[in-house]
Amino acid sequence: VADANKVRLVGYEGGQSMVAPPALWGNTAVVQKLADANRDPGIAALYAKDLANWQRISGDVLCLFSSVSKYTAQGGQPNPAGCWGQLEYDDSTDSPKMAGVRQFLAGAAGKV
């Protein structure tokens, strides 16, 4: 559509999270499993691949949503609305999502 209309394809609020359907938000086991997946080191490679796919398909700007966002809600339970931040806390040092962003940027030097 963007090419056909000769306009840029710019992504807003990009990135990923895994969110249970609202009907399952009360299922702590499901919500916890999704939060754990967002913390899994394997997410780094998937995140980098997702960003590379965007660059390959669009080659244009993609604004990632939410630099920092806690994965827990009040009471310390996993957040049923999703785990959106690249960092879970502003002093995080081991975020798999941020590692994926860094992997992508390292491989895309001169292209972004």
Residue ranges with predicted function:
Residues V1-A23:
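Glycoside hydrolase catalytic-domain groove-lining segments
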Residues D3-A4, W54-R56:
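Acidic (Asp/Glu)-rich catalytic clusters
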Residues R8-Y12, D60-F65:
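Structural recognition of the beta-strand scaffold that forms the well-ordered cores
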Residues P22-W54, C63-V112:
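Aromatic-rich peripheral "rim/lid" segments of glycoside hydrolase catalytic domains that contact
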